[in-house]
Amino acid sequence: MSFVPVAEDSDFPIHNLPYGVFSTRGNPRPRIGVAIGDQILDLSVIKHLFTGPILSGHQDVFNKPTLNSFMGLGQAAWKEARAFLQNLLSASQARLRDDVELRQRAFTSQASATMYLPATIGDYTDFYSSRHHATNVGVMFRGKENALMPNWLHLPVGYHGRASSVVVSGTPIRRPLGQMRPDDSKPPVYGACKLLDFELEMAFFVGPGNKLGEPIPISKAHEHIFGMVLMNDWSARDIQKWEYVPLGPFLGKSFGTTISPWVVPMDALMPFAVSNPEQDPKPLPYLCHDQPYTFDINLSVALKGEGMSQAATICRSNFKYMYWTMLQQLTHHSVNGCNLQPGDLLASGTISGPEPESFGCMLELSWKGTRAVELGNGQTRKFLLDGDEVIMTGHCQGDGYRIGFGQCAGKVLPALSFA
């Protein structure tokens, strides 16, 4: 229990302590903080208190404007920081609790803070690791007999996304322009995307990287995973459909990707690890692991259109539905010798479950635009309209507490005029 008041339904109890980057009106410099209740603990103010065997020589990482340097220190440093912070914030520890002047400088309300991307993202990779999602999309476009491509059950399929257009929650997303071919009997056209979609995803930040040419073995993969965020992989389905053969997604994805600002450390999630999915056929040996690394994370997506007084929940899913684990994703990414770096972002792909209400995108929820998704008050959607706000949330439910991620939200702006 912490001396900082924390509501029972708060995403950020002392069991969580996610890391983020924030600024305030009084101090516009972006800096590292930890969320506790509705407060932010400014680690740049208390960096001198990190006197453990590792962090005593690296206190300056908490004075940086991003988490990259801290991520790069590795698992032992993360564990040292977490243990220290949980002790410092506990109700029985007087060091910060009873120092009124330090508390006034160290704590900021989340409501008064501006949040930033938690790290400088050098590279971003998006996987395609939900069997339910891959099957549904395959059925739509190739038929039931050819739903999964021949490689899908043998490796975690992925593509390299655009790191420069990853934005923090609350950043508006402009409806993209591009080339489409809505009528297969006619030439392609240029214009504003008409089939704009969201994708419910999660992503993890890489900690220490690997040298070029030296793969990360799956037995060591967990040492390279810093923590997780929510992600909305915004998608222009009509642009994507026309462009993706033969090299995969390009402009249909690269216009915007939203992540939540707080990075939940893996140690906060480990109590919610569940058995890995059964994989048949068994993967090749380099992808096999026994360590449970699938997590029971409740996820939901709400949509609020213009004129709606409150958002309507249109999807409830769970991260435990993923077929390929993060350990497998990271190991496969590096198996050819590709070098990962601190702050790299690796995403899950759309998280869909077995039931229609757990489908993680409008493409599935509307089944390729053939079904209307009810929002209430007579409003429906097949794809996203201008002014729609998509709000993603997620949490693990503990006994009397929850480990949450905050929000991953973004509002659709109209496309720019085009010639």
UniProtKB/Swiss-Prot annotation:
Chain sites annotated for binding substrate: Y128, R142, Q240, Y244, T350
Entry keyword set: Acetylation, Calcium, Hydrolase, Lipid metabolism, Magnesium, Metal-binding, Phenylalanine catabolism, Phosphoprotein, Tyrosine catabolism
Keyword DNA damage included in the entry's annotation: no
Disulfide links within the chain: none
Enzyme class, first EC level, given as a word: hydrolase
Active site (record annotation): H133 (proton acceptor)
Xref: InterPro entries: Fumarylacetoacetase (IPR005959), Fumarylacetoacetase-like_C (IPR011234), Fumarylacetoacetase_C_sf (IPR036663), Fumarylacetoacetase_N (IPR015377), Fumarylacetoacetase_N_sf (IPR036462)
Molecular function per GO: fumarylacetoacetase activity; metal ion binding
Positions where N-acetylserine occurs in the chain: S2
GO biological process: homogentisate catabolic process; L-phenylalanine catabolic process; lipid metabolic process; tyrosine catabolic process
Enzyme Commission number(s): 3.7.1.2
Residues annotated for Mg(2+) binding in this entry: D233, K253, T257
In-chain residues carrying the UniProt-annotated modification Phosphoserine: S92, S309, S417
Top-level lineage group: Eukaryota
Pathway the protein takes part in: Amino-acid degradation; L-phenylalanine degradation; acetoacetate and fumarate from L-phenylalanine: step 6/6
Reaction it catalyzes: 4-fumarylacetoacetate + H2O = acetoacetate + fumarate + H(+)
Sites where the protein binds Ca(2+): D126, E199, E201, D233
Cofactor annotation: Ca(2+); Mg(2+)
Subunit structure as annotated in this protein's UniProt entry: Homodimer.
Protein family: Belongs to the FAH family.
Protein name: Fumarylacetoacetase
Species for this entry: Bos taurus
Lineage of producing organism: Eukaryota, Metazoa, Chordata, Craniata, Vertebrata
